[in-house]
Design a protein with these regions (language model features):
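Basic, helix-initiating cap at the start of DNA-binding domains
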Residues: 1-23, 28-36, 52-56
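Short hydrophobic/aromatic patch on the recognition helix
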Residues: 37-48
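Short helix-capping/turn signature of helix-turn-helix
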Residues: 48, 107-112
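Hydrophobic/aromatic residues within well-ordered alpha-helical segments
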Residues: 51, 58, 62, 66, ...
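Amphipathic alpha-helical linker/stalk segments
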Residues: 58-86, 128, 132-137
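Hydrophobic alpha-helical connector segments
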Residues: 71-101, 141, 149-156, 189, ...
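Short alpha-helical scaffolding segments that buttress acidic/His motifs in well-ordered protein cores
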Residues: 88-91, 105-108, 156, 160, ...
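C-terminal peripheral helix-coil segments that are non-catalytic and often amphipathic
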Residues: 93, 97, 125, 129-141, ...
Length: 202
C-alpha cells in the first residue's frame, strides 16, 4: 500500500511538472494533470487539495536543490574568472535539467517578489554583495575593464537564463529542433563564461 501511494504521488508530480512547464500554473488545470498522470481528478485532489499546493511542491522541490549550488558558487574563495565559470555552469545545468524552473521563477517573481525570494532561499540569500565587491576590487586593481558590478552580474545571469525563457521562439525562429537546442545549451556552459570573461579582459 505504501509503495502504491508513493508511486501515485510520483506519477502526479511528474505529470504536474510536464503540464506546468508547457502551460504555466494559471494555464494548467487539475483535470489535465490527472489525465497526464493516468488517474481520475478525485484521486488527484485526495493527494493535493489545490493546484497551488501541487505547484508549490513541484517547483520548490527543484529550486531547493539548486539554491545551495548557486550560493556555494557565489561564496567560493576563487578568482573572479573561475567564479564566473562556476556560476554560469550552475545556472545552465539547472535549466537544462529542469527547463520549467526559469519560467516558474519569472512568473512567481512578478507576483510576490520579496516573499518568493525569501521562500526560495529559506531567508539565506546568495551573497551577491560579496560578488559585487570582488568585481569592484578587480576593477580598482586594473585587472579587468571598468564595469559596474551590477551590470556584470546582470549580463551573466541574463545570458544564462534568457534562452530557456525564449526556447519556443528560438526553435521556431531559427528552425532548429529540440535536440539541437539542447546541444546548444550544453555548449553555452563554456560559451557564456568565455563571452563574459572576454568582454572584461584587458
Amino acid at each position: 500500500m505504501v509503495n502504491k501511494v508513493y508511486t501515485t504521488e510520483i506519477a502526479i508530480l511528474t505529470a504536474a511538472k510536464k503540464i506546468f512547464s508547457f502551460k504555466g500554473k494559471d494555464g494548467a488545470t487539475m483535470q489535465e494533470i490527472a489525465n497526464e498522470a493516468g488517474i481520475n481528478k478525485a484521486l488527484l485532489h485526495y493527494y493535493f487539495r489545490s493546484k497551488d499546493l501541487l505547484f508549490e511542491q513541484v517547483f520548490f522541490e527543484e529550486v531547493k536543490k539548486f539554491s545551495p549550488i548557486l550560493k556555494n558558487a557565489i561564496a567560493q574563495e576563487v578568482d573572479l574568472y573561475q567564479k564566473i565559470n562556476n556560476i554560469c555552469e550552475a545556472y545552465i545545468l539547472m535549466a537544462i535539467e529542469n527547463p520549467f524552473v526559469p519560467v516558474f521563477v519569472i512568473g512567481e517573481l512578478n507576483k510576490q517578489p520579496d516573499l518568493f525570494i525569501q521562500k526560495m532561499f529559506d531567508g539565506d540569500l546568495p551573497d551577491f554583495p560579496k560578488l559585487a565587491f570582488q568585481i569592484k576590487q578587480e576593477v580598482e586593481a586594473g585587472n579587468i575593464k571598468p564595469i559596474l558590478p551590477q551590470h556584470l552580474i546582470m549580463n551573466m545571469m541574463s545570458m544564462c537564463v534568457f534562452p530557456f525563457l525564449m526556447k519556443p521562439m528560438f526553435i521556431v525562429g531559427m528552425q532548429i529542433d529540440k535536440e539541437l537546442f539542447n546541444n546548444l545549451m550544453l555548449q553555452r556552459i563554456k560559451e557564456v563564461p568565455k563571452f563574459i570573461i572576454d568582454s572584461i579582459k584587458i
